[in-house]
């Protein structure tokens, strides 16, 4: 000892005297680099499903659209899509409104816009036929020169304007916009079969031909309605006979006669030069001007034309279009269904002293010579002039943004899975998808979507939501494919074989035949005795009973009853479970819903954070982690109960079906019918029980998922156990006593839960993961897990109340119902008890050596030392304490 003291003193004299507050460069080193390297472990989000959405514009119909997601073979793929964003394109029409003296009402030429061909179509126009012999596709225009004087053509024209021309249909709620346009908008090359691409006109007289050219020359979108007197007062007020103006007479007897009478008959009131001269001398009529305004003027902005929808006037004759800059339009929202009609109450009749109407010509004349003689001999001086035209575009949209059911059926969605991300060719056909599609992916690869076969008159975006399962499926594969499915398949086969053997058994057949005979005899005797009041329902019921029992003993009995009756129960369990479950890993695996659950609760990050909390013994987080882990184990046991409940229910159904021949025979008689009814109720209870159990289980699982994320907190790399180096030399009579921490190693580094201390600001804030919030959340999590563990007993009671099928009582205990699932779980617990006890040994060692720190037991007087055996009695416990414990 003296030598040691001397060495220490020598060192102290050699080095500089050290003080408690002195520091050295090596002490300033820190492990912040490690902290930055490991960072923090965040609480994971449960993302077993990869979800996203895409909007497919109908303008890209037929083209595959990438989702950017990959799918795995055999895993769930869900696609939901909606056409809520799809609306009808505005219906577009080009309308040419023209006054022709040969027709009592205005001529209306209508073109319809075809969105699929991106052009207007002049449909139903008379005397246009496709020229199949021509090298240039198109149509032959109406023949105005050859065979022009044709009563047949006149008849066709009359019918066309009367009822055969294209109609513009308007529905209530439609928004109608009508705008005036130039003739160049109407006569365009983008017209089906090149019909009405140019003005229809002829330089010769053709009484039966149709014309579109303006009869006011270059002055378009104008109407003239003026008496001969007003016209002549403008162009020849003096009535000079030396001027070939065409005017004659004065006052009300004034007449106007075109130099070329033949052209006047087909809608040309004046020679082109005279028309231009006249139009240059007059002005636009004042607002709200009526007929025969003085002096003569022209009507524009839609005046002189009446527009109706379903008989309701939407623009009066004297009403002008709204003018905005260079545009003139009228806007209207329809209040009723109907046909849009362009007309006027200004009459063409009596423009000439003799009729120029086509309808009169074909009725009055039998041949062309008499018609020509009529034309040449009569005076065709006009009493008034009524000519002009309007060119318009009509756009009709639906204010409700709705599309018809027929249009909806033409919108389809397809999906395609490819091995690489290369854009598939549009010619490749995909798999059709309904509005709520759910199936297993047929192969691995990239997911593509597209819209096909949309109508040409719709626009908008098809909204598609899609999701695919990305978690593991090992548990359901083991449980269902490895255990449950072999059992259910075996019991299906057993049920079928047992049933067939029963109906082929001679004793069973004799019982069935005897029961039928006895039933008919009793029925006949009761009928003869008059004790039976027969109704139509009673007769039908008895006949059905006899037919069912008679069919029961036939060879095709199993095929018939299994198809139309037994399958309701055997497939009903799977059907209800499949439709109740929302999230599942596979549609073909009815227990696929367990995979997302196990994927959540076996997440490595979750258990890693729980392990980190287990290390926090000093602040109580270890207790919270223990509660959470025990709760999860309890919940896993509840999952096992659900699986066992399904197996027992299915076995019960198959056993009841195998005994069906006995119970079906019992339905004949009233005394035994109750057994048949109980049999049906039992079958129904077996179907309902796993369904209700699963519903409750999934509801609790939703709550558990939220609570688990609150129990587990993020952990960051920090000091787990602080390390302090102390130096105390007072025992050596040296006045030195201090301690310090090494900056580069202040303690044992590891992840530490990020839990704030409780203070006034967060004590009542549930969003802050304080110790109080964690503790209460852990207790709630434990309570919910206990609820899931007791679901089987609760569901048995509920099903018993619904179906009147009460579980059997435990022998010697009338109050307690027997629970097959509980019995199975108890047997499993008995088998696993040794394993559980063995697993508790390390925990006992940890408690005894670390927490209680009982390294060596005290020796009793006259006793022996501690045996060091785990299950031996403690020697450090007095007999008095043992008595208290006992």
Swiss-Prot record:
It is a multi-pass membrane protein. It is found in: Cell membrane. Residues 1-20 form the signal peptide. Its main location: membrane. The chain crosses the membrane at residues 520-540, 563-583, 609-629, 647-667, 680-700, 771-791. One of its GO terms (biological process) is protein secretion by the type IV secretion system. The keyword Transmembrane applies. Belongs to the TrbL/VirB6 family. This is Uncharacterized protein RT0029. It comes from Rickettsia typhi (strain ATCC VR-144 / Wilmington).
């Amino acid at each position: 000892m003296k030598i040691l003291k001397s060495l220490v003193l020598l060192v102290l004299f050699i080095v500089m005297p050290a003080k408690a507050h002195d520091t050295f460069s090596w002490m300033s080193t820190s492990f912040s680099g490690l902290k930055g390297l490991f960072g923090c472990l965040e609480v994971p989000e449960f993302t077993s499903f990869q979800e996203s959405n895409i909007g497919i514009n109908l303008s890209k119909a037929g083209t595959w659209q990438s989702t950017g997601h990959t799918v795995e073979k055999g895993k769930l793929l869900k696609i939901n899509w909606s056409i809520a964003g799809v609306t009808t394109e505005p219906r577009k029409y080009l309308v040419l409104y023209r006054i022709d003296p040969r027709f009592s009402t205005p001529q209306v030429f209508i073109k319809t816009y075809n969105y699929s061909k991106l052009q207007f179509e002049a449909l139903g126009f008379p005397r246009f036929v496709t020229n199949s012999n021509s090298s240039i596709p198109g149509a032959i225009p109406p023949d105005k020169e050859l065979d022009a004087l044709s009563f047949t053509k006149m008849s066709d024209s009359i019918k066309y304007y009367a009822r055969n021309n294209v109609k513009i249909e308007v529905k209530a709620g439609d928004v109608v916009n009508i705008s005036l346009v130039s003739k160049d908008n109407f006569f365009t090359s983008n017209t089906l079969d090149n019909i009405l691409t140019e003005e229809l006109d002829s330089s010769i007289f053709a009484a039966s031909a149709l014309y579109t050219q303006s009869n006011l020359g270059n002055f378009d979108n104008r109407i003239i309605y003026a008496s001969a007197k007003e016209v002549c007062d403008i162009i020849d007020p003096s009535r000079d006979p030396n001027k070939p103006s065409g005017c004659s007479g004065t006052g009300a007897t004034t007449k106007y006669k075109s130099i070329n009478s033949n052209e006047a008959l087909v809608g040309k009131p004046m020679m082109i030069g005279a028309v231009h001269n006249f139009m240059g001398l007059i002005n636009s009529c004042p607002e709200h001007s009526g007929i025969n305004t003085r002096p003569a003027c022209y009507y524009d902005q839609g005046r002189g034309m009446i527009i109706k929808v379903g008989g309701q006037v939407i623009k009066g004759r004297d009403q002008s279009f709204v003018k905005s800059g260079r545009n003139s339009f009228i806007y209207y929202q329809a209040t009723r269904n109907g046909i849009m009609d362009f007309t006027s109450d200004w009459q063409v009749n009596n423009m000439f002293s003799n009729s120029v109407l086509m309808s009169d010509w074909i009725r009055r004349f039998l041949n062309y010579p008499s018609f020509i003689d009529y034309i040449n001999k009569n005076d065709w001086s006009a009493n008034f002039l009524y000519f002009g035209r309007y060119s318009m575009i009509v756009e009709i949209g639906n204010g409700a943004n709705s599309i018809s059911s027929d249009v909806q059926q033409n919108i389809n969605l397809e999906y395609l899975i490819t091995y690489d991300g290369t854009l598939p060719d549009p010619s490749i056909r995909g798999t059709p998808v309904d509005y709520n599609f759910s199936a297993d992916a047929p192969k691995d690869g990239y997911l593509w979507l597209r819209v096909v076969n949309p109508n040409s008159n719709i626009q908008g975006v098809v909204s598609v939501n899609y999701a695919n399962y990305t978690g593991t499926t090992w548990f359901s594969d083991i449980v269902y494919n490895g255990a449950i499915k072999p059992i259910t398949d075996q019991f299906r086969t057993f049920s079928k074989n047992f049933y067939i053997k029963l109906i082929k058994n001679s004793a069973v057949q004799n019982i069935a035949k005897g029961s039928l005979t006895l039933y008919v005899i009793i029925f006949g005797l009761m009928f003869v005795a008059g004790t039976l009041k027969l109704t139509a329902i009673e007769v039908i019921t008895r006949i059905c009973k006899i037919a069912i029992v008679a069919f029961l003993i036939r060879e095709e009995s199993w095929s018939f009853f299994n198809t139309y009756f037994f399958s309701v129960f055997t497939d009903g369990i799977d059907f209800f479970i499949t439709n109740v479950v929302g999230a599942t890993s596979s549609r073909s695996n009815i227990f696929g819903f367990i995979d997302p659950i196990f994927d959540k609760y076996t997440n490595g990050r979750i258990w890693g954070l729980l392990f980190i909390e287990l290390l926090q013994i000093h602040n109580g987080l270890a207790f919270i982690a223990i509660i959470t882990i025990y709760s999860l184990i309890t919940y896993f046991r509840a999952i096992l109960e659900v699986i066992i409940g399904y197996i027992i229910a299915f076995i019960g159904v198959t056993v009841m079906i195998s005994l069906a021949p006995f119970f079906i025979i019992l339905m004949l008689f009233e005394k035994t019918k109750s057994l048949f009814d109980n049999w049906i109720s039992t079958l129904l209870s077996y179907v309902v029980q796993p369904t209700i159990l699963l519903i409750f289980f999934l509801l609790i699982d939703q709550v558990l998922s939220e609570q688990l994320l609150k129990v587990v907190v993020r952990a960051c790399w920090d000091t787990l156990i602080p390390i302090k180096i102390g130096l105390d030399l007072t025992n050596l009579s040296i006045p030195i006593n201090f301690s310090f921490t090494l900056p580069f190693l202040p303690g044992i580094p590891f992840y530490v839960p990020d839990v704030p201390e409780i203070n006034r600001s967060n004590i009542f804030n549930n969003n802050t993961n304080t110790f109080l919030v964690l503790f209460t959340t852990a207790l709630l999590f434990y309570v919910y897990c206990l609820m899931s563990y007791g679901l089987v007993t609760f569901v048995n009671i509920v099903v018993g109340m619904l179906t009147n099928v009460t579980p059997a009582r435990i022998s010697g205990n009338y109050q307690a119902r027997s629970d097959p699932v509980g019995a199975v779980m108890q047997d499993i617990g008995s088998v696993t008890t040794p394993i559980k006890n063995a697993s508790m040994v390390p925990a006992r060692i940890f408690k005894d050596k670390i927490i209680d720190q009982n390294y060596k037991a005290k020796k009793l007087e006259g006793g022996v030392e501690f045996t060091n055996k785990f299950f031996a009695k403690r020697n450090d416990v007095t007999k008095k304490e043992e008595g208290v414990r006992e």
